[in-house]
């Protein structure tokens, strides 16, 4: 099994993260709003957070990024994106399983939001035991998902 590790982002990762976002999420974004390169790049520039986001590496290759917020009552998975060339290899499952274990150990829920049309991601989250809580956004474009809280 290929080792999966995380490293903090640096300013040098800005373009990698934008291109990753385009490859991993571009189809969903285009289906919902249409892909506007300038608007997406401006949004990315506002949100890019070196040192807080983490780069996912598999076998020493940068394959994705993850952003996790540790809140007082929950762990919130703000973003996980894996390049399509590396999807389906268990990388996301391993990272999500580790977050679910950490949430259980803390006595907290893992919470995330996912595009409603992203059926593949929703199926993965459900397979790992997360449940859909509530759709939201204009036209219910996203759904909040939550793990069942289990105390250690």
Language model features by range: what are they?
Residues 4-19:
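A short beta-loop-alpha structural element at the N-terminal edge
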Residues 25-45:
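Conserved GNAT-fold acetyl-CoA-binding loop/helix
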Residues 44, 125, 130:
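Conserved active-site tyrosine of GNAT-family acetyltransferases
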Residues 82, 88-101, 123-127:
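Conserved acetyl-CoA-binding loop-helix of GNAT-fold acetyltransferases
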Residues 84-87, 111-122, 137-146:
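Conserved beta-strand-loop-alpha-helix junction that forms the acyl-donor binding cleft
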Residues 45-55, 64:
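A short helix-loop-beta-strand connector motif used in the catalytic cores of GNAT acetyltransferases and
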Residues 61-69, 76-81:
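Conserved beta-strand in the GNAT
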């Amino acid at each position: 099994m290929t080792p999966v590790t995380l490293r903090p982002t640096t300013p040098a990762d800005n373009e990698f993260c934008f291109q990753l976002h385009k490859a991993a999420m571009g189809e969903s974004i285009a289906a919902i709003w249409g892909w506007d390169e300038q608007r997406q790049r401006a949004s990315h520039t506002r949100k890019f957070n070196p040192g807080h986001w983490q780069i996912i590496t598999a076998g020493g290759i940068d394959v994705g990024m993850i952003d996790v917020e540790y809140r007082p009552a929950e762990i919130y998975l703000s973003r996980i994106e894996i390049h399509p060339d590396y999807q389906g290899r268990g990388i996301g499952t391993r990272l999500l399983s580790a977050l679910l274990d950490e949430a259980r150990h803390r006595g907290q829920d893992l919470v995330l939001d996912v595009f409603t049309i992203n059926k593949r991601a929703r199926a993965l989250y459900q397979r790992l035991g997360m449940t859909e809580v509530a759709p939201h956004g204009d036209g219910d474009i996203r759904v909040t998902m939550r793990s069942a809280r289990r105390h250690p």
